[in-house]
């Protein structure tokens, strides 16, 4: 008799656990579906902000960059030329060969007193960049600020597709590079991967003077930089791995800086 009662109690307990698991799974599924189908609730702007007709004559000069090797060299040269400020926004930044060249160049600029601000799409940064010791060493520098745009948050899954595909580099608030290339071997350099994307960049400059288009880009960057959806990236406290990575960046930058390619 007692055995039968105990058996029934266990059976009842298993049924309750099953119902609880089913209920939790169903609630999560409903939450996920709602997150994917509800319309955006933030970021409403007037259409006139993006559809205004503009007619301006300027003295700006434009250089077209079609070659991936040139695309890397232009980035490194521009970063090396910076005297006051560097702004970099990108969708995908990886610490591969070309990416580490850029990280080393940014570190070298920060070392000579240039203020560096980076904003990187949150998903790709979390997946491919935040665990890099070299990137940690860069982000730990006193002259460097890093933000991740809209990183994944389980409490706001409906924002998971709100991505930042901007790709531009601004030097001293005057010269800038803009295009379709991310910061990785897939888009930059020539020897880091067996296949590469074909893309294009432009460099816009005006003899060191701030241009109308540069001002527009800076205003846009400031708006994106201050969004509440961004999260500051806090680098790991200085440890032996960061110190080792810093030495690697210093060596990489010295090697690239002495190269005849630049």
Regions found by a protein language model. Give the residues of each.
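Short loop/turn segments at beta-alpha junctions that line or gate ligand-sensing/allosteric surfaces
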Residues: 151
């Amino acid at each position: 008799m007692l055995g039968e009662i105990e058996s029934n109690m266990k059976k009842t307990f298993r049924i309750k656990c099953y119902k609880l698991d089913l209920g939790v799974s169903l609630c999560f599924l409903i939450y996920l579906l709602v997150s994917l189908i509800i319309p955006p609730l933030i970021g409403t702007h007037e259409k006139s902000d993006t559809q205004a007709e503009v007619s301006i004559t300027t003295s700006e000069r434009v250089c077209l960059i079609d070659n991936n090797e040139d695309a890397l060299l232009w980035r490194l040269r521009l970063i090396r030329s910076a005297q006051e400020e560097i702004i970099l926004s990108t969708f995908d930044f990886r610490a591969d060969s070309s990416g580490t060249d850029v990280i080393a160049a940014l570190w070298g600029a920060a070392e000579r007193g240039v203020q560096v601000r980076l904003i990187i799409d949150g998903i790709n940064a979390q997946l491919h960049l935040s665990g890099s010791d070299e990137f940690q060493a860069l982000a730990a520098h006193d002259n460097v600020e890093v933000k991740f745009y809209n990183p994944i948050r389980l409490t706001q899954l409906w924002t998971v597709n709100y991505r930042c595909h901007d790709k531009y580099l601004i030097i001293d608030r005057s010269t800038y590079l803009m295009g379709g290339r991310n910061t990785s071997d897939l888009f930059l350099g020539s020897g880091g991967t067996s296949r590469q994307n074909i893309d294009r960049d432009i460099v816009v400059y005006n003899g060191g003077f701030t241009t109308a288009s540069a001002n527009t880009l800076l205003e846009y960057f400031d708006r994106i930089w201050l969004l509440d959806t961004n999260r500051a990236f806090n680098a790991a406290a200085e440890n032996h791995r960061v110190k080792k990575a810093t030495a690697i960046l210093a060596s990489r930058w010295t090697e690239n800086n002495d190269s005849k390619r630049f």
